[in-house]
């Protein structure tokens, strides 16, 4: 999708009901409940015979508009907006998994996703099968009749590995298993996940979509392409909806877990959508230019960015995400002490977590996100104490490079 297509689709989505004052900005409905003209209309709404809003934990006009805008630019069947990226992951897998089922995934996962899988889902009787997602034969051998999903982070954080989505999709679909992907690192304005075989897309909208680090949010995007008749848990809903997954999620799981996005966040992130493409274009190009400069900077041991020609994942990253695959890179210094010394000398780049804010952010993953993990767990997850993760913002390449350079002296 090019910029013109993205913006035209996004800005072409009208609010479902005309505002009484003709506001060009999105109305923010902070109302918890909604009045009906009759008992009959209320019954129809609560029983799902109409699409009227009843209670903002279930649906809300402002949040629904945000969901519709995401649908318009992704060609999705259904979109559910939640209050964080982890809410998206947990809601999705509580919809998919059952006691006795298993999930096939990479060992190299974002810290909270790993914790949710290993500590939370396993307590409900769900098995997590870790494997190398870049080894298709190994992936295939892990999938069986009780596999509820093959899960992949399109670029792992902070390990920066890239799996072949088309190959994973082919193996998963041959065995009647959905491919579920966390695509947070590369936004949907830059690539089409459904074209690469992704069935369910999970996104932390806190990141690129929020833009300015103003709000927490998460998205579950169902492309409506998977045949759920082979799902042990969801096949009973196939006669009720084109997507049994979306039906189960909206009618039960998200209502019961109570993690729906708030109207204020939907308003802010809907505005963020309007500048997503132009912000990402600048940030990702800056990230590539900076990565090239860091390769030749004294004191930097190694640089990991998929867009570098000597990166082992360069070709697959280029084919899936283009020349600038995301606005995050990692680089290694000689020791943890050198990392801390460097962090403490930075003047422009902010020492903070989060990704894809308008300002550049840096963090030492091993001591923060993975700080409570054992050394053995960090080694298994591929997290090194010499690694720094940099999220590139809207600053100039020169300003970022000069800040890094002076901090290394």
Feature roles, as predicted:
Residues 221, 330-332, 391-393:
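Short hydrophobic/aromatic beta-strand micro-patches
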Residues 33, 223-226, 333-337:
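Short loop segments at secondary-structure junctions
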Residues 118-119, 127-128, 141, 145, ...:
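PLP-dependent enzyme catalytic core of the Aspartate aminotransferase-like
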Residues 33, 38-90, 112-120:
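Conserved N-terminal alpha-helix of the aminotransferase class I/II PLP-enzyme fold
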Residues 259, 271, 280-282, 287-358, ...:
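Conserved small-domain helix->loop->beta segment predominantly found in fold-type I
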Residues 43-49, 346, 404-407:
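Short Gly/aromatic-enriched secondary-structure transition segments
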Residues 1-52:
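N-terminal glycine-rich, Lys/His-bearing helix-loop that initiates the first secondary-structure elements
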Residues 7-16, 78-298:
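Conserved PLP-enzyme active-site core in the AAT-like
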